[in-house]
From Swiss-Prot:
May be involved in pre-mRNA splicing. The gene is ESS2. It comes from Homo sapiens (Human). Belongs to the ESS2 family. This is Splicing factor ESS-2 homolog. It is found in: Nucleus.
Amino acid sequence: METPGASASSLLLPAASRPPRKREAGEAGAATSKQRVLDEEEYIEGLQTVIQRDFFPDVEKLQAQKEYLEAEENGDLERMRQIAIKFGSALGKMSREPPPPYVTPATFETPEVHAGTGVVGNKPRPRGRGLEDGEAGEEEEKEPLPSLDVFLSRYTSEDNASFQEIMEVAKERSRARHAWLYQAEEEFEKRQKDNLELPSAEHQAIESSQASVETWKYKAKNSLMYYPEGVPDEEQLFKKPRQVVHKNTRFLRDPFSQALSRCQLQQAAALNAQHKQGKVGPDGKELIPQESPRVGGFGFVATPSPAPGVNESPMMTWGEVENTPLRVEGSETPYVDRTPGPAFKILEPGRRERLGLKMANEAAAKNRAKKQEALRRVTENLASLTPKGLSPAMSPALQRLVSRTASKYTDRALRASYTPSPARSTHLKTPASGLQTPTSTPAPGSATRTPLTQDPASITDNLLQLPARRKASDFF
């Protein structure tokens, strides 16, 4: 029977054309431990069984519960009965009842093992109790599967074996193509082996032999120019094989179960107190259930509370100020070096620094005085341009000139338009052209009055008072 991949190997390189060579250390170890080739389906099924057993042990139970619920939903009583017989009556219970609380031993006596109490390390009961005789016989005949690492080292699939053989053929072809690279290494190994053997008398008499012994080991693919090859781990051959016990990585029951109520804890405490009766502690004295443990004849005291009572004195008081507080300058406070390390202290400014600050303050004061004086002069000059600021000592001609000059830069009508003014009053002004003789004869008894001229307070006053259109009778 041909092994898997034999046809592929024969196509790549015939067996007769393969150059004989010495196997390397890693290949020799692999050749000694031959793996058993399994069918692809059988290999995957065995691998799945090992992984489910070691890493997912609850899958079988969950799958049975799912089938039981589906049979109950469909009304299949026969299927429900078969599942109940196969997996027992505990299938419907999702969580087991918690075991009785374990009492921690308080003495040095050997703990007693009572009959009927379960131990954590006990093996679970076999689930094949309700199986038929034929099925039980088949399970006994089956060989138990090893661990995952052992299974992978013992068995392999057809695809993996075929791939390994193809890789071996590729290596053989590479060595045949580069035979000159490995020929020197083979010659060196042969020469090294001959040197270790005891030569005959004829060879010892030959004078042309080398005086020195070759100690440098020649290798075609050295570690300098090629990647170093792995060294076979021979240390594990002398040690006991290690394995991972996967069941120890899981809890057999929930350690944080809420089923242990306060009542059960009280029962455990009472049971522990009963066990202490008549027992002797590590100090050689009898244990009293209601008494706290003692060390050297003295019991433990309660931890003092940081918050004192109402009638007790407080731990800290701030004191009272009975007089006017007085500020103490830093220079008057004596400096006490309480710590050996360096301390921070603000020093008083030096004489040079104080003199510089004084000169800077004086220069700033002078600049402020000059600025105020210049501002005052500008204000006086602006005020002298208005008629209100005319001095009575000035001549009338000079006063008229100043008034005429100031009136060029000010518009009274414009100023009155945006400046609120009190109730306007009619001012009487003398006409600039002098007195004029009226054209009409004044009525007897009426005094001659100066014509009234109203000074408009704003340029918008009398804007809508348009002059009336003259008639023809006004020209005759």
